[in-house]
Amino acid sequence: MDRSSVPDRLGRFFLPDPRSKFLGARWLFLRALGVFHFSVFYSLAHQIRGLVGDAGILPCSELFAFLHARLGISRYFLVPSLLWLAPNDGGLVALVLAGLYFSLLLILNVAPRVSLVVCGVCFLSFVAAARDFSSYQSEGMLLDATAAAFLLAPRGFRPGLGAACPPSRAARFLVLWEGFRIYFESGIAKLASGDPTWRNLKAMDHYYENGPLPTWIGWWAQQLPEGFHRFTAGATLAIELVVVFGVFFSRRRVRLVTFAILTLLQLGIIATANYCFLNHLVLATGFLLVADDDLPFRLPEAVRYVPTKLRLRASAIWIGWLFYASIAVFAFAGAPEPISFLGFPASVLEPFRLANRYGLFARMTNVRYEIEFEASTDGVTYVTYPFKYKPQALDEAPGIYAPYQPRFEWNLWFCAIDEEGVPVQRVQRVARLTCPWVIRVESRLLERSPFVLALFKDDPLHGAKPRYVRAMLYRYWMTDPRALRATGKYWRREFIDQYIDEAYDEE
């Protein structure tokens, strides 16, 4: 073999590929990414001031004041956020408006690279400042996908399909690599977690009942026979650990079969549970398995495009750094931490939430606990604050609203699962350690903060000021079709205990 062939081939890997047959897949993936960003900022438009605003649950101004007092110039690197410029309601609203505007431009295929940068920076600015309300794996997935998509996207203001700027094989590989890692690392994490339900295939027995925000389809799926749940548990492991390797094959049949199987898995999850944009995003990475020739219509051919040496080198460095950093977390999926010499590139990217570790559904929850808030004007009669999305009313069917993400209600589910296996007498003590922000919710409700009240469906006191607010813990079960016909109820529940200390007005 000619020695020059290796660097030549490596160079062609990073160059825009004039023979690319994935113009349509790239176009669709970028439009989908715009939709996901729009859903994020749209949901934040309704929640952000209640979550981290000046009168919210965890004001970002408190975080920035704390960091400013204790850190030097490194604070801008450790917490990269535009909110350093204005850590207040005005800055939060500006962030959301910019995100909405540029995500809409990305959907419309206007200046896709610029739109991706602005969407990514605005989203990172929120994630870095939101503490408990941005601690999900989906955050890292979206930021990873946005960073990879920047290298995949065509240049120009109105590039159309981007035939004049075809994607490089390296950029396409980076997106597929993220999708592969999400699947494979999640499969490894399931086996490495020590949860016996994945090994004995009982993990899905109560999955639909105990997940964060189920749908009405999930309610019916829970009623299916035990054999179905065993099959889906085994199929999930097989797909995540074996089938997903098909993303690296170029043969048409392997690509399309892999795409079909992965898509069916994600559609099943989307139909039965509301995981915001998470599964939509994972599904969208699979678009890049479908070539233009696989479509029933013809698309324009890619043309030769040669970038400047500076752009080519910058692209190669960015792709190489992201890939190398992700190798650290991929190679040690299921381990506590990657070894240091591999972990350094990932540690540099960590403040930017890039090259993340994934491990979806590594441990399954065995019970469903729910927290709800009650208020009283006299300390005797209490009324309940109704939620917008999560299970509460026993006769209300679970809804479908993903990719919208109700972060407040989502976080309450995570607080509640911390109580699994905790003796009743220790519930409040554990809650103070794991979710102290719940007390802040009580305090804001005492103050009648309009932005925190807006996180609920309505005000049960109809404008009256509460003197007492408390959080109560319940255990929930799904009913069955016979009980539904007899009582009209989708849920039954049992009171467990007061979740955390009651807040009261001393005046």
Model-derived features with residue positions:
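Alpha-helical membrane-anchoring segments
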Residues: 2-507
